[in-house]
């Protein structure tokens, strides 16, 4: 009933859906013999939005909308500088994976297996950014997990199922969406076993975690606790099938190039033997020759390597690549700082020599692209601290001396240039 008589004989109106009176809600909208309140309208809009978003994910993965490998590569180029071979390998692997999902419902004699991906490359070479960009491009749930925090079930640390729990959180616990997501497991090299022989002692954060990851990566029905954390006997679990989740594992694998070099450059003895320094070859070039036996010798178990059939290697970024990373991508660091200063109505100019100094410093620190922001932050700290309270500044100029710590930013006022911090 949409209306009732009040004690003062005036007609009191009620929402036909939730039963709240007109005094309990902000607005009551009338229809033919029915009323609906603003709260119910908001709830309906939310339901429609969620269903539209779910339909959007399905539509985005349909064959007609699934970008081709070349289109995936072109989009990766907008965000990631260099690493051309790795981008091509990833584009093909991701395209084939979601093309396979599109045809799951079709009955066929040939069953297509999942091809998970292993990314090998130094810190700051773009492994995580590549995975993040792929997930954003495909509009699928995405989560980053740190392998170093994982332990075997029953020990202090995170169970491997917690990775899937985080994936569920990222898509509001919609199981169907989570089952088509992407999981990036970082620092996979840090859980290598201590020797290439099977362990006879318990290694709960190394080989034990690799064993725990096996079924998850290959495809299993994972029992996920809804609120995360450890499992409890009286707890209800969410069942998630990981068969169609794409797993991308990444790691720096420091020392792997030595393992590969020892295998490929077995020199002879005598006057005819070729004497060649192992340092002559670029590390990225060496890593491209990675074979499963090298990864086993490094400390990954053969079973896990077999479940990561697509291997993409990334090389170290040189000075020219780091300078491009600073200015060329859509969300390049220099563009971000230009925007920050523009909010203060100040123009920021970072001169080419300063960009070169930033790149050189990142190479010295061996942090790759990941260390670029901290270098610029350090150089701009004083001027960003003082700028909001300064009057009349129209432009800030950064040269190489500022980056090297030998000078201060040049501030351009209406007519007279001044140095930051000078009176």
UniProtKB/Swiss-Prot annotation:
Residues that bind Zn(2+): 15, 18, 37, 40
Binding site for ATP: 122-129
GO BP field: cell division; proteolysis involved in protein catabolic process
GO CC annotations, alphabetized: HslUV protease complex
HAMAP family per record: ClpX
This protein's UniProt keywords: ATP-binding, Chaperone, Metal-binding, Nucleotide-binding, Zinc
Keyword Zinc: yes
Record-linked PANTHER family: ATP-DEPENDENT CLP PROTEASE ATP-BINDING SUBUNIT CLPX-LIKE, MITOCHONDRIAL, ATP-DEPENDENT CLP PROTEASE ATP-BINDING SUBUNIT CLPX-LIKE, MITOCHONDRIAL-RELATED
ClpX-type ZB domain: residues covered: 3-56
A matching Pfam family: ClpB_D2-small
UniProt keyword Zinc present: yes
GO molecular function terms attached to this record: ATP binding; ATP hydrolysis activity; ATP-dependent protein folding chaperone; protein dimerization activity; unfolded protein binding; zinc ion binding
Cited function: ATP-dependent specificity component of the Clp protease. It directs the protease to specific substrates. Can perform chaperone functions in the absence of ClpP.
Assembly information from the UniProt record: Component of the ClpX-ClpP complex. Forms a hexameric ring that, in the presence of ATP, binds to fourteen ClpP subunits assembled into a disk-like structure with a central cavity, resembling the structure of eukaryotic proteasomes.
Protein name: ATP-dependent Clp protease ATP-binding subunit ClpX
Family: Belongs to the ClpX chaperone family.
């Amino acid at each position: 009933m949409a209306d009732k008589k009040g004690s003062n004989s005036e007609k009191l109106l009620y929402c036909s859906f939730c039963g709240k009176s007109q005094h309990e809600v902000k607005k009551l909208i009338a229809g033919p013999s029915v009323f609906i309140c603003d709260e119910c309208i908001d709830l309906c809009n939310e339901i429609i939005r969620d269903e539209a978003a779910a339909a959007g994910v399905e539509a985005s993965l349909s064959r007609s909308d699934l970008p081709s490998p070349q289109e995936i590569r072109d989009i990766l180029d907008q965000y990631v500088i260099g690493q051309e071979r790795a981008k091509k390998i990833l584009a093909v692997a991701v395209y084939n994976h979601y093309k396979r999902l599109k045809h799951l419902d079709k009955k066929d004699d040939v069953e297509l297996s999942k091809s998970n991906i292993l990314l090998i490359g130094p810190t700051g070479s773009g492994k995580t950014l590549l995975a993040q960009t792929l997930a954003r491009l495909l509009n699928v749930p995405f989560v980053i997990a740190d392998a170093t925090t994982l332990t075997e079930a029953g020990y202090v640390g995170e169970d491997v199922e917690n990775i899937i729990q985080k994936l569920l959180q990222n898509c509001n616990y919609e199981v169907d969406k989570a089952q088509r997501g992407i999981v990036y497991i970082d620092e996979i090299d840090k859980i290598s076993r201590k020797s290439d022989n099977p362990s006879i002692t318990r290694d709960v954060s190394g080989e034990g975690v690799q064993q725990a990851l096996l079924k998850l990566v290959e495809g299993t029905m994972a029992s996920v606790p809804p609120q995360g954390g450890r499992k409890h006997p009286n707890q209800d679990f969410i069942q998630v099938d990981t068969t169609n989740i794409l797993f991308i594992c990444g790691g720096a694998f420091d020392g792997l190039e030595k393992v590969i070099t020892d295998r490929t450059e077995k020199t002879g003895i005598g006057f005819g033997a070729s004497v060649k320094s192992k340092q002559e070859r670029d590390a990225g070039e060496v890593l491209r020759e990675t074979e499963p036996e090298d990864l086993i010798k490094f400390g990954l178990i053969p079973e896990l390597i077999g479940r990561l059939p697509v291997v993409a290697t990334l090389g170290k970024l040189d000075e020219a690549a780091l300078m491009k990373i600073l200015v060329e991508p859509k969300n390049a660091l220099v563009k971000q700082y230009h925007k920050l200063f523009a909010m203060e109505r100040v123009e920021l100019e970072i001169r080419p020599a300063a960009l070169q100094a930033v790149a050189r410093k990142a190479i010295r620190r061996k942090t790759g692209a990941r260390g670029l922001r901290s270098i610029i932050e350090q150089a701009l700290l004083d001027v960003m601290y003082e700028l909001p309270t300064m009057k009349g500044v129209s432009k800030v100029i950064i040269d190489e001396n500022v980056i090297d710590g030998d000078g201060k930013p040049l501030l351009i006022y209406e007519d007279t240039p001044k140095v930051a911090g000078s009176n």
